[in-house]
Amino acid sequence: LIGLEGEGLTIIQKNGKVYISLEEQLLFASGKYEINSEGIIALNKLASVLSFQEDLNIIVEGHTDSIPLSGKGMVKDNWDLSVMRATNVIKVLIKNPKLNPIQFTAAGRAEFVPISTNKNIAGRRDNRRIELILTPNLDDLFKLLE
């Protein structure tokens, strides 16, 4: 995964999990949930790397800043936007036939888990992101312990 870092993607390991963070501008136009062509390319590369890890559970979280949306249609607020973004990321990733949809969970976190301040442009930009949280599937381990 390290080779994918940079250009809007960061990787952190903590508490036995791997966190992959994708900046909004890599994937989406502001306030939108449709993935752009650059984002599709990045997600396809990520899917290729993830496809070698069959024993992972992957939570895809959408995060927004705290600016309310003035949305109409399907996306009415930051909750909707964060969920739709997470879901669309998963839909691109699972186009890779080696990734099993059962490995994935989509979650919308809206503006409630910021990594920076929402009081300035740079902080809000940091908060608008997709995070993939990779955790080992421990089912086989638990079966051994029974």
Roles of regions detected by a PLM:
Residues 8, 55-57, 101:
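Short secondary-structure junction motifs
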Residues 5-11, 43-52:
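Short amphipathic alpha-helices and their capping/turn segments at secondary-structure boundaries
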Residues 17, 57, 127-129:
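Structural motif
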Residues 13, 22, 134:
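Pocket-edge structural micro-motifs
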